[in-house]
Amino acid sequence: MTLGHRLIPVQNVGIYVPAGRYPLPSTALMLTIPAKVAGVEKVVACSPAFKGFGTVHPAVLVAMDIAGVDEIYCTGGAQAIAAMAFGTETVKKVDLIAGPGNRFVAEAKRQVLGSVGIDSIAGPSEVLVIADEMANPKYTAIDLLAQSEHDPNARATLITTSEKLAADVLAWIKTYAGELSTGETA
C-alpha cells in the first residue's frame, strides 16, 4: 500500500479582473499564471469595460494574452460571477472562480459558493502596521498607502508607541498622497 496525495488541477477556471478606478493588468497575471502552471486546461476571464474605452482596458487585454487566457468576456460585477458559476449561452460554466472585486462581487461569490469553487470572499483592502521608533517613516507610509489607495473603504492603521514616528509617517503620507493619481482615495 502506498499513501500520499496527487495534485489534480480543475479543468477550467474563471478569473475576474475588476475595472474600477484604474486598470489591473497585474491581477490578470497573478490569477492566470498560477492556474496555467498548475495545469488548468482553460482559463476564462471576465472584466468590465473600462471608462473611456468601451471594452476591457488594452493593458489588461495584453496581460491576459501574455498569461494565456483562453476566453475573454467584457462583463463585470455580480452578473459576471453568475455567468461563470452557472453558465450562459455564451459563457460556459467553470469549476472555480478567482479574483477580487467590490462588495457586489464579493457577495456574488459568497452566493455561488457550493455551485462552484471560489478563491475567497475578499472585502476592502486593509493593513495594520505595528512599528516602533526604529521604523523608517517613509517605508511605513508607503506600506499604509499601498493598501489605502485601492478603495475608499480600505483601512490602513498604524500602531506605534512613538509620537515622532506617528508624526513623521503622517507627513510622508500627505507628501506621497499628493503625488499619487489615487491620492484622493488614499
Language-model features: locations:
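Short beta-strand/turn micro-motifs composed of small residues
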Residues: 17, 47, 131, 160-161
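Short, hinge-like loop/turn segments at secondary-structure boundaries
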Residues: 61-65, 90-92, 174-176
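Conserved NAD(P)+-binding/catalytic subdomain of aldehyde/semialdehyde dehydrogenases
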Residues: 66-155
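NAD(P)-dependent aldehyde/semialdehyde dehydrogenase
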Residues: 153-186
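A structural signal for isolated positions on well-ordered beta-strands in alpha/beta enzyme cores
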Residues: 42-44, 128, 157
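Short, conserved catalytic or adaptor-binding loops enriched in Gly and charged residues
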Residues: 63-66, 119-121, 179-186
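Short acidic, glycine/serine/threonine-rich loops at helix termini
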Residues: 26-28, 54-60, 84-87, 107-111, ...
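Conserved small-residue-rich beta-alpha loop and adjacent elements
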Residues: 1-58, 62
